[in-house]
Amino acid sequence: MRRKSFQTAFVISLFTLSACGSTTVAPAGSASSSNVDFGSERILGQSEKNPSTPFLRFAPDGRLFAIWSEDHDVLWPEGSHAAGHHRMSGDRAPSPMRNAFLAWSADAGKTWSSPRRVNSIVEAVQGEENGPKVAFGKDNKAYVVWSTPGEKGDKTRANIRFAMEDGKGGFTPAKTLNEVRDAGRFPIIEATPDGNFFVAWIDRRIDGPKPRQLYLMRLDSNGKALTKNYQVGEGLCECCKLGIAFADSGKTVYMVDREVDGQKIRNHVLRKSTDGGATFGMPVDISNDGWQVPSCPHSGPSIGRDSRGQLHVTWFTLGRSENEAGIYYSVSKDGGKSFAPRHLVHANTAPEILYNNLLLGDDDTIYLAWSNLDGDKKSQVYLRTLAADGRTWSSIQHISATRGNAGRPVLALLKNQLHIAWTETDGETSRVIFRSATVGQ
């Protein structure tokens, strides 16, 4: 394969409840790296509307925001029938429509504002890896992106939607960012150090059997496009989330994604820009996992940059054999030129897809959350920390406690307040679970 450079021109209920092929196994734990003591579970959103796919982020003023999607209300007409059952007016009907909701907490998640719907028109807001994301301007305004299916309802031919707070308690009318319709999926949005915004997504405007492309655009603080859509990479796995990090006041931009070659081998790569995201150099392999799988696993990498400039990446792979399957970690100490041999953080207990999320504390402690199967073959959420020395791992903590399945965890951290949220499913129903902890004491 490869590689060339590209150039631009609510009601919130509270319930207690790179060395190729090289691998090193992280130690089981250390007395000097203690576990995180989380508080009781809270439920975000309206449980009867099946909330799912949360995303957490702090605004500059210290408020914690959560965004998620949930079912749109549809009422059966008086005396109507569905699936052979008589429905009375006022009963909810199944609906493919989903809305994005945003809420905030000013007291570390103890209490929350009423959720606000972000999308101005009812549409099928996508979830899972493709769920809504939020970033914040220097004035604390929220900027949100999400994905909706194309005109024919095809999730693989979708559109990137954007809205921002309007300063009046609501959101601007949603607009589509991809200039070629029915071509964008899996968007992320990040505030740049200069006060603007990067939006990145996986694009299929050049259709065919080849892998997808990586596209970017820039927005200003008013939501106005500063650039057209532009391609910065190719060969992407079409259904895995992206990651982004900045350095040098935004002059250096790092992006991570999962690549796929002609033999359907799927490895993760780092892309680096030294001109503020205008152009990106050739991809660097993070690890040669050699995972060959015919379809996209819907499980992308996470990236973080510490105070020393080191890049930390986590990901999931099934590898070349079942014995290699699990969540992995690696670090680059030379600005992304190379990566250390991968560390196995948690071995896969069954041939299932796992999901991960990473963030760094002010003291360069790494917090890593992921999903894996327990002894009953139920998906559960786990957490582990890596101290700033890069050697001291905590033990693996089981964070969720559900009779169903828990997955797709996300993290947020401000000073010593760590927060985690995930989607819990039981049959056809889902809900969003939230927990908090004080760390670093």
Q: What do these predicted regions represent?
A:
Residues 1-10:
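Bacterial N-terminal signal peptides that target proteins for export
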Residues 17-19:
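C-terminal motif of bacterial Sec signal peptides marking the signal peptidase cleavage site
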Residues 23-441:
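Extracellular, repeat-based ectodomains that mediate carbohydrate processing or recognition
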